């Protein structure tokens, strides 16, 4: 076997047939080894003083029922089992119940008022009941898309058109990251329950923004990031040399090509190398004190939503700008009670623990927490096994908490059956405008030119900051 000869940048560049002048070669080699340009956001941002500097988005994929979580409607129980009044549904978009005889499904949970604020919360969410004074519940959300994939796309990118940047990518592009050895936008999906619907990686893609701003998915079990470990027999020093050489070649090529995606590739190689050291320590939650693990109900390596919530806090501590946690088991067309117990059992305590932990550490004051799915569920019965509910876009619930958000309030309302958002309607675009505002960004001024258009997260249709929920 031939002995290993250390790879040096000069020897590689001078013997590999790359045509570089002496001046160009010396200029490249004079760069600080492996120094990828640090990105700290766009000039001129933030537009105003931010209330928060980071976001954690708890995404309940599948469409949790507002009528079994936060939206109590006594009138629904009075009409239980009776035909759904046509005045509510005539001409309205309906998913799987289209063409069937519609009947009212009463609440499948018990509701009570909780906290000093007296907010209605169902008995599926006993830990949420403990924290209602910390959250602002929006009960008048609406969206445009009634099927999962386009609805996910709408909630994440502001449009149902595929290929647009996600909200996390927009934030990462605008403000940059405070962390040098982790991505600015991290996504995790919990491992739990039955066979949930998949989530497309488009939901955290950067679209027409440079690829360096896309979300990076960390695995909840096994290796956190695939292919992050060095091949057998390759040391960290050898890997460092290789990354340096590839970066130098890319920079030389890009001096001619001037392609922004080459810069992206350079930064991705550099970030991958740094993550080889940072990610294993980050993901090892066994180092957390026993009382913290017990608070979340987290078990190291189990891939649960609880473990992901704890990991999310660790990501925020290290300066990651935007963290998105998916829990994918909320599509309850039938057996709603059974599956609500499973979903809420997996997420309720962990969500409360996350807010509690952030408060204890003084982090909630400058962190925005978002909870919700892509749409809600119908007030009408759908039967697959036990009673369930179909997709619903005309009124559902989400909540926000953290810096700049009024805790202990409910905003907006649906009608007496929970069908239409009837008061203070909040569209997905309004939610996005509000998130950007809390980060110090004016949504109307934040965009990029693409294919001759001024592209924004909030699009061209009217949108507003929901100032009524802001502290």
Question: Which residues make up each language-model segment?
Answer:
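Ligand-binding pockets and gating/stacking loops
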Residues: 1-471
């Amino acid at each position: 076997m031939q002995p290993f000869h250390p790879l040096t940048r000069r020897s590689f560049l001078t013997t590999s047939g790359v045509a570089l002048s002496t001046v160009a070669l010396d200029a490249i080699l004079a760069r600080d080894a492996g120094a990828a340009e640090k990105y700290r956001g766009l000039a001129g941002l933030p537009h105003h003083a931010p209330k928060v500097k980071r976001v954690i988005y708890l995404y309940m994929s599948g469409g949790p029922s507002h009528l079994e979580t936060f939206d109590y409607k006594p009138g629904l129980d009075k009409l239980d089992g009776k035909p759904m009044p046509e005045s509510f549904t005539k001409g309205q978009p309906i998913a799987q119940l289209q063409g069937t005889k519609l009947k009212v499904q009463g609440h499948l949970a018990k509701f009570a008022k909780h906290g000093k604020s007296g907010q209605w919360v169902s008995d599926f969410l006993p830990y949420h009941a403990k924290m209602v004074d910390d959250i602002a519940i929006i009960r008048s959300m609406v969206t445009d898309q009634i099927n999962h994939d386009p609805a996910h796309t709408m909630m994440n990118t502001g449009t149902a058109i595929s290929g647009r940047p996600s909200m996390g990518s927009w934030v990462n592009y605008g403000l940059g990251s405070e962390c040098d050895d982790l991505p600015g936008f991290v996504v995790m999906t919990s491992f739990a329950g039955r066979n949930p619907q998949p989530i497309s990686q488009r939901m955290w893609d950067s679209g027409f923004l440079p690829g360096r701003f896309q979300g990076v998915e960390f695995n909840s079990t096994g290796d956190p990031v695939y292919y992050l470990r060095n091949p057998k027999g390759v040391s960290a020093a050898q890997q460092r040399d290789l990354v340096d050489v590839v970066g130098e070649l890319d920079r030389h090529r890009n001096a001619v090509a001037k392609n922004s995606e080459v810069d992206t590739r350079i930064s991705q190689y550099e970030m991958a190398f740094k993550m080889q050291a940072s990610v294993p320590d980050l993901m090892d939650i066994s180092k957390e004190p026993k009382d913290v693990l017990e608070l979340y109900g987290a078990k190291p390596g189990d891939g649960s939503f609880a473990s992901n919530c704890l990991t999310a806090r660790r990501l925020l501590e290290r300066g990651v700008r935007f963290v998105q946690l998916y829990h994918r088991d909320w599509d309850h067309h039938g057996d709603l009670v059974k599956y609500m117990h499973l979903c809420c059992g997996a997420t309720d305590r962990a969500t409360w623990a996350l807010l509690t932990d952030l408060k204890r550490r003084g982090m909630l004051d400058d962190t925005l927490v978002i909870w919700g799915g892509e749409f809600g569920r119908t007030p009408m019965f759908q039967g697959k096994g036990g009673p369930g509910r179909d997709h619903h876009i005309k009124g559902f619930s989400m909540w926000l908490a953290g810096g700049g958000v009024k805790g202990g309030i409910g905003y907006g309302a649906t009608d007496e059956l929970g069908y239409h958002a009837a008061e203070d309607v909040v569209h997905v675009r309004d939610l996005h405008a509000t998130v950007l505002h809390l980060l110090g960004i004016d949504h109307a001024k934040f965009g990029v030119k693409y294919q001759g258009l001024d592209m924004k997260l909030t699009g061209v249709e009217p949108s507003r900051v929901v100032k009524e929920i802001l502290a």
